């Protein structure tokens, strides 16, 4: 019996930041550990050789970003279709929003969210027009879209009206497991400084904590300070910190590697995710795995992911966030309860389910 041949394009891993980077890694782990023997998987690149090459990742230099986009376009529209034809591939999985325009293989395109269309003001105008055109151009009648949550599926269904869209929950890194020992009382957020992350609301809530003499609790804001050369939100946050003399209480280590992420989780008393909108929320499942209790905004997607294993505050309201942090600090039983519920909830996000849902598409 002839095996179905599935090609996974991971070229974008060369420049991927935390969210997409983790998605690609987890997809490959899921294939390795739980992929069907009846399917032949072909991976475009050796990820172990790509992992240490960071030249293109989030470069602040426009020329470097342009060079990568040229190489990316050449790969996606010329090299990749040639390889798919040469290797007689049945399905190609593109986890980076974009599929080749011309190829005989059936296409599975992962579009992680609808934020490019929902918040056009958050992206450089010309780049956004180019990238959204590229996304739409690669989608045809042989394409199925995969997205990360039911919330994202609903949003994308408005944009791609005549395309099949399937929601598949990604898995969490198994290394983030049960070692939480918050001796340093960190209140933590891990993620890029982007406008929709609403980190200023978190800093304002934390200021109230300091004003009320909770001086033992340090705020850690880990993640890239700029996104492709644009760092306005970081400077907004930093200016607020400077204005109110909070530098002694807030750490901003910038982009950190996995080993450092594990260490921060292990020392965190609370994980706070104040976003105004997300397609999924990888740090939520990492926190649940790490047994760190979660406070997050009451947006729809977070309720889908966390269910009853998080404490919610009104999105954008720093006073409400302060009240929720205060409750957490003073109620260890509540923290323990939510950690227990989180450990149960996070079992939904496993590698077996992740790849088996993909395989339902091409089986």
What are these regions (language model features)?
Residues 1-363:
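Carbohydrate transferase catalytic cores enriched for Leloir-type hexosyltransferases
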């Amino acid at each position: 019996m002839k095996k179905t041949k599935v090609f996974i394009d991971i070229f974008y891993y060369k420049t991927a930041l935390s969210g997409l980077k983790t998605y690609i890694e987890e997809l490959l782990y899921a294939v390795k550990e739980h992929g069907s023997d009846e399917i032949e998987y072909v991976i475009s690149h050796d990820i172990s050789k790509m992992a240490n090459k960071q030249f293109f990742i989030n470069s602040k230099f426009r020329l470097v970003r342009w060079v990568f986009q040229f190489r990316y376009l050449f790969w996606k529209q010329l090299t990749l279709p040639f390889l798919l034809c040469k290797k007689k591939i049945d399905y190609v999985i593109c986890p980076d929003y974009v599929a080749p325009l011309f190829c005989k293989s059936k296409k599975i395109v992962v579009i992680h969210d609808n934020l490019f269309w929902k918040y056009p003001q958050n992206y450089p105008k010309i780049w956004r027009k180019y990238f959204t055109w590229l996304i739409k151009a690669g989608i045809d009648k042989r394409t199925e879209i995969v997205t990360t949550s039911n919330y994202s599926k609903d949003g994308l269904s408005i944009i791609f009206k005549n395309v099949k869209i399937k929601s598949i929950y990604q898995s969490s890194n198994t290394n983030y497991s049960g070692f939480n020992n918050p001796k340093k009382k960190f209140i933590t957020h891990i993620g890029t400084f982007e406008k929709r992350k609403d980190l200023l609301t978190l800093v304002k809530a934390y200021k109230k904590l300091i004003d009320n003499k909770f001086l033992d609790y340090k705020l850690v804001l880990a993640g890239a300070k700029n996104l492709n050369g644009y760092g306005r939100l970081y400077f907004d946050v930093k200016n607020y910190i400077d204005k109110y003399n909070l530098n002694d209480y807030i750490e901003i280590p910038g982009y950190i590697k996995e080993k450092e992420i594990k260490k921060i989780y292990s020392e965190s008393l609370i994980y706070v995710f104040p976003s105004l909108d997300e397609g999924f929320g990888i740090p939520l499942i990492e926190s649940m795995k790490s047994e760190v209790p979660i406070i997050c905004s009451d947006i729809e997607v977070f309720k889908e992911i966390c269910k009853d294993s998080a404490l919610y505050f009104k999105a954008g309201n720093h006073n409400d966030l302060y009240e929720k942090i205060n409750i957490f600090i003073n109620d260890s039983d509540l923290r323990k309860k939510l950690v227990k519920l989180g450990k149960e909830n996070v079992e939904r996000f496993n590698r077996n389910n992740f790849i088996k849902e993909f395989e339902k598409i091409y089986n």
